[in-house]
Structure formats: structure tokens, C-alpha cells
Amino acid sequence: MNEEEQFVNIDLNDDNICSVCKLGTDKETLSFCHICFELNIEGVPKSDLLHTKSLRGHKDCFEKYHLIANQGCPRSKLSKSTYEEVKTILSKKINWIVQYAQNKDLDSDSECSKNPQHHLFNFRHKPEEKLLPQFDSQVPKYSAKWIDGSAGGISNCTQRILEQRENTDFGLSMLQDSGATLCRNSVLWPHSHNQAQKKEETISSPEANVQTQHPHYSREELNSMTLGEVEQLNAKLLQQIQEVFEELTHQVQEKDSLASQLHVRHVAIEQLLKNCSKLPCLQVGRTGMKSHLPINN
């Protein structure tokens, strides 16, 4: 019974373990940090010391500990923390998206003055220019209206096509109306605009204009034609109508695609400007994104 009631005494004081390298050794070889002791004598407060008097360890371990602690890292590496790099990349991305979405390229060069086009087609990204609104500026509201006066232009052009559909002079010239938004000479038709401009430069005399127009046939001329000539003329006219409507369909689809992209960009601008108030580290200004939170190195 006496042997079962005996307990083993365990010494919880690890006096034989170095507080730096955590290796067990003889108690005689362990001592307090002599470097911290000397610094304390020189007037350094105890709160600034690395080791207290209660810590025991090897003399070499304390010296190596202080040597490593005194090796300061370069300031440039400390300043470039992961948070700062991510914040910089995010700021540049937001800045680029807002600048691209606003389409505010106000640089008026000679090309823009000679060939005035819609601002959607002459936008050029310049990273040095930061076209950002003020932080307290009003969020721009998107309007579903495509262009001022566009509805009237589309209806006029459509009405003109329907009125002259039975005319033998039906062709691309019907759509070359400067007042109609969907006509070829409009800025919304950039691909065919250059071709029409080249044709206008080559055609300068009224005689040439008469030659380029489709021939008109009177009822007597049509009656005098043979059945084969009439069928050939009819097939040619139908082919011209098909080509015009295919081109018109392509341009309308392109316009719808641009309108959809413009809508997405306006929504993105609204969301970005609203979310800026939720990011305390970013402030939108004329000079771009600025950080107001100090980075703990």
C-alpha cells in the first residue's frame, strides 16, 4: 500500500533549458543576458530590453539573438508590403476602368478637327491622364436614350425606305441622308463612312453624278423590253435590295452592341463611384487614387 501511494515529484522549473535555443544543458552554463544587463546599466529602460533577468540561456545564444535583432532590413523592402502592392494594383485597375468607361479624351488634335466623329470612336487611352470625378461629385445617372434626336432620325429613314420601296432607284443612295441617324454618312457607320467619302471625292461633276445613279425606266421602255430583259432587271434589283438590307442589318446590330457596351460602362461607373465611399483607404480625386491609411511596416 505504501508503494502505491508514493508520488513522483516533477520539477516544473526548466532551469536547464536555454530560453533561446530551447536545448537542455547544465545549469552552470546558463546565465542571464549580459547584453541586456549592460544596456540597462547604460540607462536603457527595462521595457525596451529584449530579455528580462528571469530568462536564462547560453551566452553565445544571447549574442546571436541580439546580432540578428540589430540587422535592420532595408526600408524599401519594408515599405513594399503585400497590402500596399495589392492596393496599388487595385487602384490602377479602378483608375483605368473609370477612365476608359468615361470616354473623356479631350485632346483636340488635327485629325479630330478634320474628321469629327462620335466620341465613342475617337477615344484613345492615355495612362498619364487621370480623368476621375471628385469624391463628393454627384453620381452620373445613365439614360437609355441613345443620342439626342436619334428616334426622329430612325423614323425618318425608315419612312423614306417604305415610301420609295417600289422605286427602281432604290439603293444605298436612299440611306445617304445626313439627317438620318442610321444612314451611311452618319458617324455611327464608321466602316462605310470612309467609302462614301472616297466616292464623293471622285465624283465632282453633275455629269458624273448622273452616270453613277441607277437608270430610270419609263413604262414604255419596260413594255418594249423582252421578258428575259425584264427578269434580268428584276433579279438585279432584288439583289441590290438584299445587299442594302444586309448592310443595314449589320450596322443596326453594331449599333445595338455599342449601345449595350455603353450601358454596361455607365452602370460600372455608378457602382465604382458608390463603392468608393466604402473603401476607407481610397479617395477619388483629380490626381487619382490616394491612400490615407498608414501602412504598418
From Swiss-Prot:
PANTHER family: PROTEIN EURL HOMOLOG (PTHR15961:SF3)
Compositional bias per record (Polar residues), positions renumbered to this chain: 203-215
Biological function: Plays a role in cortical progenitor cell proliferation and differentiation. Promotes dendritic spine development of post-migratory cortical projection neurons by modulating the beta-catenin signaling pathway.
Residues covered by region (Disordered): 194-216
Alphabetical keyword list: Coiled coil, Differentiation, Neurogenesis
The organism's taxonomic lineage, starting at the top: Eukaryota, Metazoa, Chordata, Craniata, Vertebrata
InterPro entries registered for this protein in UniProt: EURL_prot
Keyword Coiled coil carried by entry: yes
Residue stretches in coiled coil: 227-256
Quaternary state and interactors: Interacts with CCDC85B.
Protein family according to the UniProt entry: Belongs to the EURL family.
GO biological process terms, semicolon-separated: cerebral cortex neuron differentiation; positive regulation of dendritic spine development
The name this protein goes by in its record: Protein EURL homolog
Segments crossing the lipid bilayer: none
Source organism per UniProt: Homo sapiens
Signal sequence annotation: none
Pfam families registered for this protein in UniProt: EURL
Record flagged with keyword Coiled coil: yes
